[in-house]
Amino acid sequence: MGIFDWKHWIVILIVVVLVFGTKRLKNLGSDVGEAIKGFRKAVNTEEDDKKDQPAAQPAQPLNQPHTIDAQAQKVEEPARKD
């Protein structure tokens, strides 16, 4: 007996049918179905395009790393005046 019991869903469905009417709900259902079909078709064609393309080679880094040889120097901090 939660807030979304099956009885509540029946009441919500009746209110929606009264507000929108059965004809508008039928058109909405067919539009949603066509949208889902279009989405699936687009996903399937995109996957087919990926299968047709050869695997990409890993890219080379633009700047090759380089090492600088140097000696560390000791830095003395100035005395604090507290």
Curated annotation (Swiss-Prot):
Keywords: Cell inner membrane, Cell membrane, Membrane, Protein transport, Translocation, Transmembrane, Transmembrane helix, Transport
Parts of the chain that traverse the membrane: 1-21
GO molecular function, one term: protein transmembrane transporter activity
Pfam families, per the entry: TatA_B_E (PF02416)
Region described as Disordered: spans on this chain: 43-82
Gene Ontology process terms (BP): protein transport by the Tat complex
Keyword Cell inner membrane: yes
UniProt key word Protein transport: yes
HAMAP family given in the database record: TatA_E
Protein name: Sec-independent protein translocase protein TatA
Organism expressing this protein natively: Pseudomonas aeruginosa (strain ATCC 15692 / DSM 22644 / CIP 104116 / JCM 14847 / LMG 12228 / 1C / PRS 101 / PAO1)
Lineage: Bacteria, Pseudomonadati, Pseudomonadota, Gammaproteobacteria, Pseudomonadales
